[in-house]
């Protein structure tokens, strides 16, 4: 992306030079963490759109976030770190910032581990340096000094919030827990813009709606601790969503013509230090969807066109591992695992984690990708899904509760308040930044049926705030809600009764719906893939673990992909397009008579290529880029074409667009790169044939984009 922005001329281009890398570093600092296998692992799915003008200039960027691993905030896996930003702030804050944020050297934070106050020196130095880089990145990405200060204060508030301890006050008649370290409570309340007493009440009590009546639940120390962690996770996820949306407001353009989309997911998850939960299930489901999309794109999508062209016999069938059955197990409607768990969650508390697994087994016990397991140490049933990357065993503990993802209405009332309230008591946080994070756009709430000023339910949407761009120009399709989808579907055969909550959105179903829209967009583009292989599991340089690499290569099917692409024809054009593109060299060969198809046949014979290298279909001619580059160069040599001073090989290209699904620009870019490789490895230094083919291809681009900038290099 940096190379694309550097090559972009003008004032807007000079801004993008700093804005795009800055925005990437900001999201990386707040969304990445050090894991056992990666020192900078992304903990959220990211879809980035590079937006281009009609002249092929990069003009904007839009980023969508998918499923941030918010549980890491309060409970990082054993041996792994929390999100980078916490360590950056603790290690890199200035003396004044430390004093204001109460980040003393002796302070240790529960959310960073027991030794957070004294990290190893090298890591601390690196974190401190990166904090300085982060502040510069925030500035370049369009954040004001006030926003930077408020962001750092909220991150510090989350760290201090994790240090709150609860106990039972025997001198009071109530059974609710109280905060033991009141000085930390006062500090957190000050940072959040509320009173310490109001914050303590929100943490020690929980309001629930039972049969249209509000009930107050007294929380013991363990319950208050869980409530504290829920608030910390909510604050961090809202902050992350706000950061991303603020960047989009600065960099996203509505008047772009085409785009290049980059989709990146955390790799398949299989925890060793703790049980796999709904978070790992959703990430593995997304990877399963992506793997299936890649498989269909590489092995299946072009076959109907080849058959219609009458050239399917040139493409031998390659046997590959098809994960469609596993995907059907996960997302089939009705009756897939996601559909069942959503239905069970909506009928809570009548349905539990145990009944959910029972419904799984009743529907899928004989499926090859599903296996019912033994109860875990806590007595909760387990089940195993045989993903494409390998079997993963999930504990059902907390699945229903996490899938509902209910946000305590007390937190919303405390921090957002109610601006329509007649009394001034429920005004919310006096910190406008905190209050803004809990806006109606970020938090969906449900009011009491008899009192609109009383919030009885709240939820943070799992979908990104924006939708991916679609094929229609100048329109943004909103992501359909799960309720819209479920209205058109039959209930699961195990779910005869209607959901008790009237179709409350659930995490798994909403995430599936968001992925549906994303892959609909990806299906309208020309896809390219990058397979990431980890050389070893110890993050050591110059080390290659053969068994680990072999397993990764097998799981993504690289051998099958290679076999398939040996016989593919990525370069395709109609007979007329072929004749028009190579009209000048064909005339030099004396090929000027006959139909377009006959001219292609004459060219193939003159170049000495077989029908396997240049395949004539009923409507199109298919070319192999390597053979094409070598053959055309040989033609130029044999017929002594007039040479000119070499102008160098320019890699001008246009991005593949939804309207130009064939991705002509991308195909020519690949031809250009292959031509350069061939010229460097196969052509003696005295030969200079490359400029002629380059001229023909540049002319083709100029006909499509007349105003192509002369310095648009890729």
Residue spans for each PLM region:
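Core structural elements
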Residues: 123-127, 151-165, 191, 206-214, ...
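Long, non-coiled-coil amphipathic alpha-helical linker/lever segments
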Residues: 130-132, 189-235, 619
């Amino acid at each position: 992306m940096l190379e694309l922005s550097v090559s972009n001329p003008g004032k807007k281009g000079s801004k993008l030079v700093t804005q795009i890398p800055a925005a990437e570093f900001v999201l990386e600092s707040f969304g990445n963490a050090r894991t056992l296998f990666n020192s900078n692992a992304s903990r959220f799915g990211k879809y980035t759109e590079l937006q281009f003008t009609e002249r092929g200039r990069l003009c904007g960027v839009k980023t969508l976030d998918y499923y941030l691993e918010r549980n890491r905030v309060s409970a990082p896996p054993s041996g792994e770190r929390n999100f980078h930003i916490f360590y950056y702030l603790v290690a890199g804050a200035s003396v004044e910032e430390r004093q204001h944020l109460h980040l003393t050297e002796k302070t240790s934070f529960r959310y960073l581990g027991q030794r957070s106050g004294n990290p190893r020196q090298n890591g601390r130095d690196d974190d401190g340096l990166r904090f300085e880089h982060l502040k510069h990145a925030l500035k370049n990405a369009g954040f004001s000094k006030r926003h930077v200060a408020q962001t750092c204060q909220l991150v510090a508030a989350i760290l201090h919030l994790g240090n709150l301890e609860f106990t039972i006050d025997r001198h009071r008649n109530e059974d609710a827990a109280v905060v033991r370290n009141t000085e930390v409570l006062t500090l957190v309340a000050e940072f959040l813009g509320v009173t310490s007493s109001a914050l303590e009440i929100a943490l020690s009590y929980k309001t629930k709606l039972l049969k249209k009546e509000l009930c107050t639940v007294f929380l013991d120390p363990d319950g208050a601790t869980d409530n504290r962690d829920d608030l910390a996770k909510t604050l961090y996820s809202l902050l992350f969503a706000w950061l991303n949306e603020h960047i989009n407001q600065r960099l996203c353009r509505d008047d772009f013509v085409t785009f290049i989309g980059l989709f990146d997911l955390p790799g398949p998850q299989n925890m060793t230090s703790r049980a796999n939960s709904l978070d790992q299930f959703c990430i593995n489901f997304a990877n399963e969807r992506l793997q299936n999309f890649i498989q269909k794109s590489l092995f299946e999508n072009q076959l109907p066109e080849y058959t219609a062209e009458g050239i399917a016999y040139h493409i031998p069938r390659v046997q590959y591992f098809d994960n469609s059955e596993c995907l059907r197990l996960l997302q089939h409607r009705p009756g897939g695992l996601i559909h069942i768990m959503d239905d069970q969650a909506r009928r809570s508390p009548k349905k539990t984690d145990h009944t959910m697994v029972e419904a799984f087994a009743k529907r899928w016990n004989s499926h090859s990708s599903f296996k019912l397991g033994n109860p875990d140490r806590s007595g909760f049933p387990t089940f195993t899904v045989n993903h494409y990357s390998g079997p993963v065993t999930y504990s059902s503990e907390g699945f229903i509760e996490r899938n509902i993802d209910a946000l305590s209405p007390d937190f919303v009332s405390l921090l957002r308040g109610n601006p329509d309230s007649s009394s001034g008591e429920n005004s919310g946080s006096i910190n406008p930044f905190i209050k803004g994070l809990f806006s109606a756009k970020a938090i969906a709430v449900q009011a009491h049926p008899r009192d609109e000023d009383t919030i009885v339910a709240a939820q943070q949407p799992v979908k990104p705030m924006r939708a991916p761009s679609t094929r229609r120009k100048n329109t943004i399709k909103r992501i359909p809600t799960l309720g819209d989808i479920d209205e058109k579907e039959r209930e699961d055969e195990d779910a005869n009764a209607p959901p008790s909550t009237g179709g409350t959105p659930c995490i798994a179903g909403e995430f599936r719906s968001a992925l549906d829209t994303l892959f609909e967009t990806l299906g309208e583009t020309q896809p390219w893939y990058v397979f990431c292989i980890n050389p070893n599991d110890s993050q050591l340089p110059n080390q290659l673990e053969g068994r680990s690499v072999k397993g990764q290569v097998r799981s993504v099917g690289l051998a099958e992909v290679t076999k398939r692409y040996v016989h593919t024809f990525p370069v395709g054009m109609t007979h007329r397009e072929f004749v028009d593109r190579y009209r000048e060299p064909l005339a030099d060969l004396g090929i000027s008579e006959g139909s377009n198809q006959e001219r292609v046949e004459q060219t193939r014979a003159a170049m000495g290529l077989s029908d396997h290298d240049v395949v004539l279909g009923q409507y199109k001619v298919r070319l192999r880029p390597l053979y094409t580059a070598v053959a055309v160069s040989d033609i130029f040599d044999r017929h002594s074409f007039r040479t000119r001073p070499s102008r160098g090989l320019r890699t001008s290209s246009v991005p593949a667009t939804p309207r130009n699904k064939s991705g002509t620009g991308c195909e020519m870019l690949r031809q250009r790169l292959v031509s350069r490789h061939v010229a460097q490895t196969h052509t003696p230094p005295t030969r200079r044939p490359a400029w002629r083919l380059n001229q023909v291809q540049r002319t083709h681009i100029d006909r499509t984009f007349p105003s192509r900038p002369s310095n648009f290099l890729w």
